[in-house]
Curated annotation (Swiss-Prot):
PANTHER family: TETRAACYLDISACCHARIDE 4'-KINASE (PTHR42724), TETRAACYLDISACCHARIDE 4'-KINASE, MITOCHONDRIAL-RELATED (PTHR42724:SF1)
An MF annotation (GO) of this entry: ATP binding
Descriptive protein name: Tetraacyldisaccharide 4'-kinase
Protein family per UniProt: Belongs to the LpxK family.
Cited Pfam families: LpxK (PF02606)
UniProt keyword list: ATP-binding, Kinase, Lipid A biosynthesis, Lipid biosynthesis, Lipid metabolism, Nucleotide-binding, Transferase
Amino acid sequence: MKTRFPSPFFILYRRLTVAISFGKVLGWGCLGRILSWMFSCIASFRRKLFCSAPYRASSTVISVGNIVLGGSGKTPTVLWLAENLRARGYSCAVLSRGYKGKCSRQRKLIVVDPKMHSAAYVGDEPLLMAGKLQDGAVFVHKDRRVSAKHAAKNFDILILDDGFQNTKLHKDVEIVVVNGQDPLGGAEFFPRGRLRDFPNRLKEADFIIVNGSCCLENQKLLNTWSSSPKIFVEPCISQVLWEPSGEQLPLDSLSGLAAGVFCGLGFPQGFLDMLKRAGVKILGTYLLPDHAGITKKELHYFSSKIALRQGRGILCTEKDGVKLGNLVHEQGILPVGKVQMRFDFANHEDSGVSLLNRIDQIHNGKR
């Protein structure tokens, strides 16, 4: 008889891949030191190898990137920029490489349509952003010069998603997003830490967005590496979209809710802490590697586990939610709540305005 649950071997495999992605296996001992050194050498060599004259697009190009492996908050930053620049009268397009999407491997230029495309084809983040952008577009191609040439024909501003390591496209504004709790990713390259680039490159940033609570010690650490203006933001929950009902509930609906949580994030602890602050009673977690989607069998397994603990639902991020597709309609699955988030400015809205004003100046200077 065919089981609807994953095998114990698959669950073990999942736990192992999560542990590896967080540096809890390969980061041990001499092996970890050797692999971290190799990773840093590759990062250095790659930058020197591709350090040629970058392509200059006719539109203003804003890069949003980081120096660690995932979990810093790039996607909310991109969406915040696009929304606020649109409010100032600009047309915006997002340029993504479609990480883990099939079309990126095929080197096809795709303008993402949420009604036509899946996360498996274009990538989870491009699909999420395309569904949220108003009057904008998300272009996916492995070579961002190709997408920039096409997007510049119709859009004033091009936002380069995960663009800090991109040397092929000229960037007018360089924004680096860091996690306030761990801005330097443990200060070691993967797998001993979460660094993907050298901290001294922070001095190349025009603005640094510090996402989440940042203690005085971490602020001093950031100031040691870069004198660029810091914008402190606090991610918070705006509402929860429950599937399959489509019901949208405010933040206070989470208070006292007993639920399970699954997510595929580079820094899942930040999401879990946010839910706890909102009053969620977390009955269990199912962690996935960054960008990985939960399978049908895994969802049945986790839902049954939470139901046995008298849970009322399962919570996940919007990024995880776009990968679910029709799985939310599976019989026997608890309701799935997709948690939607927004930014609050910790050092006043003026800090965000200064960034937008800087983009205004640069864009007007290019005309």
